[in-house]
């Protein structure tokens, strides 16, 4: 080994354990003292909520001074409402057992009212459960004296209206006080102060209308229908006249005008149809009859060359017009009587078709062309 390394090794002093601890722990932590470690051990301080942070920075984004001064309170959890205490529970609270319990529990009052209230609530629950299970006559009488009479529900009102419908309907001339209750389904009028006792007793109606009983204190029915029928009588239906049977004079006057306006095409005569189909433009007639030739050219060619073609086309026009008019008559007859459909089907239609007509026109034009060529040859 070199001598320099031995000299450095001999110069190193032995390190004590106290020196090792002081060198490992920084000096700034030692100067902070024991409070620093206690704060680290404690839980983190409560962080501000979003509402509180917005409340602190409200002046940055709000211009109104009223809004800045107003403070938004945090939302509190809903407090559970106490159940309502019935009169029987109030009487149980005033019983000597609870009074003795309250007198003996003076130490509980000194400690605080909360434990005493919880004990009372538990005792009340036990009393209510026991009172619901036991049904004694004295308790029913006592509750009937304290509680007001129950109001009639929908079923009782329905029974009352059903019983009112069973009453005999008075004559129209007499001023009977039962006119308001004679109709089925009408609600009875509110009872006055004089009839308050009679309104408390309800009518008990059985399944059949013949068995009708009254409660004590109610007025008897003045008139009851005979017991032969097992259902309440239905009111007579008003006679409504059929709308088609009765017609006003205005409707009768409006009907012919409307009928004429709806079907104007069926009122045409044969002459109208013939005029309609014979009103053809002069150019079309000249083309089909004389191949569009001028009168001078027709005189040069000779009218006898066009006589046969003219007769064919004119007869075709007459027949087509008569056929259309006969078809219209057949449609009118078929609408009025269904038997004419069979006769129309049995009738053979006119034999000239569009193809045959075109063939005749082409043949006629070809004959004209041949006549022109023969005339040119004769002139040469």
Swiss-Prot record:
<keyword id="KW-0963">Cytoplasm</keyword>
<comment type="similarity">
    <text>Belongs to the FAM110 family.</text>
</comment>
<feature type="region of interest" description="Disordered">
    <location>
        <begin position="327"/>
        <end position="347"/>
    </location>
</feature>
<keyword id="KW-0206">Cytoskeleton</keyword>
<feature type="compositionally biased region" description="Polar residues">
    <location>
        <begin position="127"/>
        <end position="138"/>
    </location>
</feature>
<feature type="compositionally biased region" description="Basic and acidic residues">
    <location>
        <begin position="153"/>
        <end position="162"/>
    </location>
</feature>
<dbReference type="InterPro" id="IPR025739">
    <property type="entry name" value="FAM110_N"/>
</dbReference>
<protein>
    <recommendedName>
        <fullName>Protein FAM110B</fullName>
    </recommendedName>
</protein>
<dbReference type="InterPro" id="IPR025741">
    <property type="entry name" value="FAM110_C"/>
</dbReference>
<dbReference type="InterPro" id="IPR025740">
    <property type="entry name" value="FAM110"/>
</dbReference>
<dbReference type="GO" id="GO:0005737">
    <property type="term" value="C:cytoplasm"/>
</dbReference>
<feature type="region of interest" description="Disordered">
    <location>
        <begin position="92"/>
        <end position="272"/>
    </location>
</feature>
<feature type="compositionally biased region" description="Gly residues">
    <location>
        <begin position="100"/>
        <end position="110"/>
    </location>
</feature>
<dbReference type="Pfam" id="PF14161">
    <property type="entry name" value="FAM110_N"/>
</dbReference>
<feature type="modified residue" description="Phosphoserine">
    <location>
        <position position="311"/>
    </location>
</feature>
<dbReference type="GO" id="GO:0005813">
    <property type="term" value="C:centrosome"/>
</dbReference>
<feature type="compositionally biased region" description="Low complexity">
    <location>
        <begin position="239"/>
        <end position="248"/>
    </location>
</feature>
<keyword id="KW-0597">Phosphoprotein</keyword>
<dbReference type="Pfam" id="PF14160">
    <property type="entry name" value="FAM110_C"/>
</dbReference>
<feature type="compositionally biased region" description="Basic and acidic residues">
    <location>
        <begin position="336"/>
        <end position="345"/>
    </location>
</feature>
<feature type="modified residue" description="Phosphoserine">
    <location>
        <position position="248"/>
    </location>
</feature>
């Amino acid at each position: 080994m070199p001598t320099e390394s031995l000299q450095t090794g001999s110069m190193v002093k032995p390190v004590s354990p106290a020196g090792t601890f002081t060198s490992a722990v920084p000096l700034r932590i030692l100067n902070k003292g024991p409070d620093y470690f206690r704060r680290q051990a404690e839980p983190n301080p409560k962080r501000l909520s979003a509402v509180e942070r917005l409340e602190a920075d409200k002046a940055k984004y709000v211009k109104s001074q009223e809004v800045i001064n107003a403070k938004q309170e945090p939302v509190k959890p809903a407090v559970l409402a106490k159940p309502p205490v019935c009169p029987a529970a109030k009487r149980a609270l005033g019983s000597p057992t609870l009074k003795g319990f309250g007198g003996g529990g003076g130490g509980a009052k000194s400690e605080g009212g909360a434990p005493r209230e919880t004990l009372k609530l538990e005792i009340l629950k036990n009393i209510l459960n026991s009172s619901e299970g036991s049904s004694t006559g004295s308790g029913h009488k006592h509750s009937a004296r304290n509680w007001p009479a129950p109001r009639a529900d929908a079923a009782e009102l329905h029974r009352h209206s059903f019983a009112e419908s069973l009453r005999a309907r008075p004559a129209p001339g007499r001023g009977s006080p039962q006119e308001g209750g004679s109709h089925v389904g009408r609600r009875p009028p509110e009872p006055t102060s004089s009839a308050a006792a009679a309104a408390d007793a309800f009518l008990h109606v059985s399944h059949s209308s013949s068995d009708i009983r009254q409660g004590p204190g109610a007025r008897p029915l003045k008139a009851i229908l005979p017991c032969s029928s097992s259902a309440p009588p239905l009111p007579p239906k008003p006679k409504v006249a059929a709308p088609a049977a009765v017609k006003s004079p205005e409707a009768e006057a409006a009907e012919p005008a409307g009928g004429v306006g709806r079907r104007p095409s069926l009122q045409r005569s044969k002459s109208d149809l013939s005029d309609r189909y014979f009103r053809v433009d002069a150019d079309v007639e000249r083309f089909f009859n004389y191949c569009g030739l001028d009168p001078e050219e027709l005189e040069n060619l000779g009218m006898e060359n066009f006589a046969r073609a003219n007769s064919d086309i004119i007869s075709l026009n007459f027949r087509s017009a008569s056929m259309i008019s006969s078809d219209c008559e057949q449609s009118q007859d078929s609408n009025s009587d269904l038997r004419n459909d069979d006769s129309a089907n049995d009738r053979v239609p006119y034999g000239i078709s569009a193809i045959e007509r075109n063939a005749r026109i082409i043949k006629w034009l070809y004959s004209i062309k041949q006549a022109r060529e023969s005339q040119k040859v004769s002139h040469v």
